[in-house]
Amino acid sequence: MVENLHSFSVLPNLERKTSLKERFVGILLVELPIYLLYHDGTDYVVKLSLIDIWNLDGKLKILFMQKRNLLVTIVFLFIGVCGMSAERIRQNFDFDWQFRLGEQGTYKTVQLPHDWSIGLDFSEEAGPESGYLPGGIGYYKKDFTVPLSYKGKRVSIVFDGIYHKATIYLNGREIDYHRYGYTSFETDLTPYLKYGENNTLSVRVDHSEKSRWYTGSGIYRHAWLQVTDPIHVKMWGTYVTTPQVSTSSATISCVTTVANVSTSAGKIEVEQQLVDAHGNSLKINGKRYAVRTDVVIPENGTKDIEQSFSISNPQLWSLENPHLYHLEIVLKQRGKVIDRYTTRFGVRTIHFDKDKGFFLNGKNIKMKGMCLHQDAGCLGVAVPDRSYERRLTILKEFGVNAIRCSHNPPSPEFLDYCDSIGFLVIDEAFDKWKSGYYEQFFDDCWQQDISDMIVRDRNHPSIILWSIGNELAEATRKDNVGVERATMLRDFVRKLEPTRPTMLALAPAYQDKFAAVTDVVGYNYSELSYIEDRKKHPERIGLISESYPYYSGLRPYEARDYSDKNPWNYVMEYDYICGSFMWAGIDYIGESMGWPSKGWAASPFDMCMDEKPRAAYFRAAWTDKPVVKMAVVDYSIDEDPGKDHWQTPPMVHDWTFPYTDSRVLPIHTPSNCDEVVLIDPRGKKYGPRKPKDYLNNTIVWNQPYRPGKVVVIGYKGGKEVCRDSIRTSKPVATHYTLTPDRSTLKADGQDLSFISLQLFDENGVPVRINDRMVTVRVEGDGRLMGIDSGEMRRELRFDSHSLPTYFGKCQIVVQAGRIKGTLKVIVQVEGLPEQVLNIECL
């Protein structure tokens, strides 16, 4: 990547599928390679033998030419096409930031999303809550230029998430302050800009105090620079609802908030129309759907414009077919387009029934849910979009259909993927109220923070519930303070967004009157409590907002006494239970049980998104595909067990043990098949046995350990439909494989490849013993993001270039740069030959 470029930041955001001539904004020439900068902020290098300057419609103006260290920079402004365009500009603002940690630190170049804590040394003083990673105070700055032609426009910066207590400065002047670390916010830059000159945007981030889990530190989500006409659709200013929905027709209603920051009123035309993903008018059965309204927007004010129309034969948003529509709002003044704002939405109905649970489009659905924190292993909380997409795709294939965002609003991109992949989502405002981390903010910020979440997220069809708190201290108070506080929040949400119910997630101890406040009750680890509550309150609607992954409570209102009966069994036994959300779906940093563990290790997926043996029960229970899996229980297995009742018995998907005494080992075999047969290492068959005859549909075969191969076969209707096998490996690995999830990436500076490394013996059997040190380096325009193994007790930093395998495997994460070419990933495994993996960046 070319360093020290004067970036010309205010450029239109157009789709890449338009022609090169339409998209082309500037050419930066560095020797022979030609650096192309696109409207959306992405760019790459092509090689040209001649300087090729394109004149768009004859409206090309050369602004300046500068020579520095053999670098010739030519920046173009297309008058009437981009520079003087009155339409909205939204440009990614992630690149070329400078960052320093603390007052005495030195600035270094970083790109967003950025989490400074994930790149620090572990410190026992930082504590288990944060995964022994410190916070501190960090400083960011970025230089950018706004052309003179943008005088009279409104220029703003949107931050999708900064953790936390962010103070925003422009050219040395404090212009904004945002406390909460999980909500997006917009800051107006217009009054403080220097047009035609360099501007410096600075951000001070104060993460001095601890939270209850790993939060990360810094500008850990995307940033966007926006330019609009003084009269424009307000940021997050559309509210799309579908008040009438059937298979034959649907009514689309949209309230659009239009702002006018000028000193005179403006008469405009507001048009809304359905468009496709590329902005072209969408016709259904040959009919174009659009509606127009003439309005006057008051000076220095806003106006809400409500418009609606009906469409025939709508495609409903569902888990199987998450169809999405696009509604474009066009503002015109004197016949000229001054703003375009597109909102993606879905047409669907939701209903919670006290007796039958949850319905989507009239179809009864059990929520097969997981609670998720937002960090992603070695990436920390600075999670590129591709990581979200990969994680959710894996969970979808596993059978998950619902996500609880615990305990904060997620990134906009996360919700976009939930919409497009097909998940039900509980969007959660915060954890505690006037206790814990949020206590310092509650009185001053709760209205703003709830509003920020709802106004930003209300058009996502995946969201079905607004959660206003988790395991609240107020729930146990015998006075009315807790009830009054809960009622205050509930009423605020209902007024702001009445189409979705409200929810509170309650710990096992709570006052009955507190549980009655919200539309839906979330029971944490309290399946039997819900069953008892049902007898007293048959009108109550509820779900299991947190459940253990293996055990369940043995007595009502007592989460610390438990049985082997999996909590999911209760969900299936009682129609009125809407679903369950396992804590947690994926291992995460923080909330560790003590040094050297760096986080939560009791989930069905590790931080690499590798499925643990314990996950087999849920795969069999949550998917229609035939499943039979083996998990061998052995208490000598060296693993981080996680916290007490969230643990499972230690299991491996392997048949390599040090025993020579024919020791009996339980082989757990969850299955959704009719019958299962086991074949031991001597070839002897056992069964068939029926999973339905066993607790949790899990057959337990008690087998004496003998080296060799164990096979299980699943049958449906008397025919084999699936099988699983485990083998004894040699003690020493002789080779390894590198398997990327994708070998071709976008050269956009953001895209990722996740490379799985697996050790094998001479017979091609995976080796999980005698782990080896792995060292990685990357050549080309890209970078190593980190190495993960799923081992929470790791000693090396998350950004280390070396890490031992764990149970014979690890994962390498690399990110593309912004120059087309080949990214070479060079891997050295201790005692084995070096390998080179090529990743193409296009």
What are the residue ranges of the model-derived segments?
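Short, hydrophobic beta-strand segments
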Residues: L189-P191, E306-L316, I699-Y705, D799-R818
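Beta-strand-rich structural segments
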Residues: C254-V258, V330, Q647-H653, I667-P670, ...
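Extended carbohydrate-recognition surfaces in non-catalytic/accessory domains of CAZymes
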Residues: A86-Y163, G216-I219, V627-D644, P650, ...
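Short glycine/proline/serine/threonine-rich loop/turn segments at secondary-structure transition edges
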Residues: Y150-K153, L193-N198, R212, A265, ...
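Extended substrate-binding grooves/exosites of carbohydrate-active enzymes
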Residues: K108, L112-E124, R173, H178, ...
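Short flexible loop/turn segments that cap and initiate beta-strands
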Residues: G266-E271, L282-N285, L319-H326, V664, ...
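Beta-strand-rich binding/interaction modules
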Residues: S249-V296, L665-K685, K709-G714, V774, ...
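Accessory beta-strand-rich segments of carbohydrate-active enzymes
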Residues: Q91-F95, R100-G102, S130, G135-Y239, ...
